[in-house]
């Protein structure tokens, strides 16, 4: 797709997909942009603008066919493809990710987990998933065609791991380390502490 899609649009696209999934479960066949906006606390014009990046989906005065739009957005998001992942870092976060079974149900299959700690190497991190030495990371990624790397290492090691993953052919990175990493592949940063700070700010502001 030639046109560059703003990152906020991609995030909202995921919300649209999940909302449409719920609508299908409810047996809804047609939905308007106004109803989607109400459910997602957005403006209908924003939804229409976001969807226009990818083509024409609805009819003015009629709305969107829920199943058709759900399938179309799913295709855009790559949900029908099974994605291979590796986790680097077998600490609490890394093991939690490896044991999150919902990921496999949604098409994300973790096929390897790596660490540099000798006390963790060779131990089971999740059912059927044994911790490997991080020195084997590049070879594993290349041999298995891994597409997504999950970084769950201390901040001081995150950039190095990201660069190694990129050189090995990783297509995207999910970063749990509390530091921004710089690589040419797409990166999604998950900073739990930062999110909690935003939450506490809202709590304090609401109760002041």
Curated annotation (Swiss-Prot):
DNA-binding region per UniProt: 15-54
Gene Ontology CC: cytoplasm
A Gene Ontology molecular function term of the record: DNA-binding transcription factor activity
Bilayer-spanning residue ranges: none
Keywords, in A-Z order: Cytoplasm, DNA-binding, NAD, Repressor, Transcription, Transcription regulation
Binding, NAD(+): 89-94
UniProt-listed InterPro entries: CoA-bd, NAD(P)-bd_dom_sf, Rex_DNA-bd_C_dom, Tscrpt_rep_Rex, WH-like_DNA-bd_sf, WH_DNA-bd_sf
Record GO biological process: negative regulation of DNA-templated transcription; response to redox state
Main location: cytoplasm
Keyword NAD annotated: yes
Keyword Glycoprotein listed: no
Compartment list: Cytoplasm
Highest rank taxon of the organism: Bacteria
Short name of any one Pfam family annotated for the protein: CoA_binding
Entry-linked PANTHER family: REDOX-SENSING TRANSCRIPTIONAL REPRESSOR REX, REDOX-SENSING TRANSCRIPTIONAL REPRESSOR REX 1
NCBIfam families attached to this UniProt entry: PRK05472.1-3, PRK05472.2-2, PRK05472.2-3, PRK05472.2-4, PRK05472.2-5
Family: Belongs to the transcriptional regulatory Rex family.
Purpose of the protein: Modulates transcription in response to changes in cellular NADH/NAD(+) redox state.
Subunit structure: Homodimer.
Protein name per UniProt: Redox-sensing transcriptional repressor Rex 1
Gene designation per UniProt: rex1
